[in-house]
Amino acid sequence: MKKGIVLVANLKSQWYCENLIFSIRKSGCQLPIRLINFGGEPVNSKKILDEVEFLKVDDFSEDAKVFINNLRSVLTDCPIGFLYRFLAWFSDWDEFIYSDNDIVALMNWERLFDFAKGYDVVYADEEYTTQGIFNYLLPNKIEEIFGDGSLSTAITAGHLLVKKNPKMITDMNAAVDWFKLNPDIPRKHDQSLLHIATLIGDWKLLNLCKPPFNWLSSWSGDYKNSLELIQAIQGCEERKTASFKSWFASLTDENRKPYEQRSLLKNEKVSISHLHYSGRGRIGPEAIDDFMFSSQSNETRMMRFLKVQIADLLYITYIKGQIKRVKRYLNR
């Protein structure tokens, strides 16, 4: 079976992408990588272009373009470049891993395919513990429509392994129709639509962060620094994130039992596939951000940290943040 890794990037996200590819190869992963242009100025880094097959939207079929335009008709809260990840479903690969650029590989991703038998999608995140607040304006409606537990199958669309089948495209088009019929329920971005498609099509999902595997959370915000992450991987302490604790408290005693087994992992090595720096306005000021500079020389890395600090001191970061908030408000 043909398989590989799909990325989407442009010149603006180039340094993230460069670091991601560095971490993928450093882990020992030799899977082929295809990079789709996000739009705007394309990447020009030799370090990237030497490792990838570079593709543009025009390299895909007309059916693929029609599909993207259909998604765009309801997914109005994100740039169209975010939707180009879905072009991977129209490639000649049978299986693929899609990854956002603000991710660092912490293991050889070829190992993820060992878990794919019998599943449509394999992923490793704790999105399910947020109880739908980032995917839906009315999350309670999801369980009313699709049944109890439907929010607990949430996926972070930024990193997932997919075993393709034609039904997936049909289900995602059906999810577009569902968005049109229920405009007040979902947030208008790709992650919520993907989740609705999995519910409509009853996709077989495997979340490695759930029992029986209990992998560590892949969100960088759950770790203060590199030491805390390393100790968590070594099983030095029980890792229950803030969102997990909140979600766990809402469960019945019976439903808590599989998750209480997490305590048995203490002093045993625990797996983690990657770190995802999603939901971050900038990278650099926090200790755990160090991984995002792994591909850079010591001098370049320190200069980037210096620029971040200067931007904070001169209130440049604050001003940029306020401008973004105003733009989001005006575009609503």
Which sequence ranges carry the predicted segments?
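Conserved catalytic core of nucleotide-sugar-dependent glycosyltransferases
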Residues: 114-178
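Active-site-proximal specificity loops/subdomain of glycosyltransferases
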Residues: 44-91
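N-proximal low-complexity "stem/linker" segments adjacent to membrane-targeting elements
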Residues: 1-21
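A glycosyltransferase accessory/donor-loop signature
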Residues: 1, 169-332
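GT-A fold catalytic core of metal-dependent nucleotide-sugar glycosyltransferases
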Residues: 83-133
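Short, charged/polar "capping" segments at the starts of alpha-helices
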Residues: 15, 40-46
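Short, acidic, metal-binding catalytic loop of nucleotide-sugar glycosyltransferases
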Residues: 23-31
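Short internal beta-strands
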Residues: 33-39, 123-125
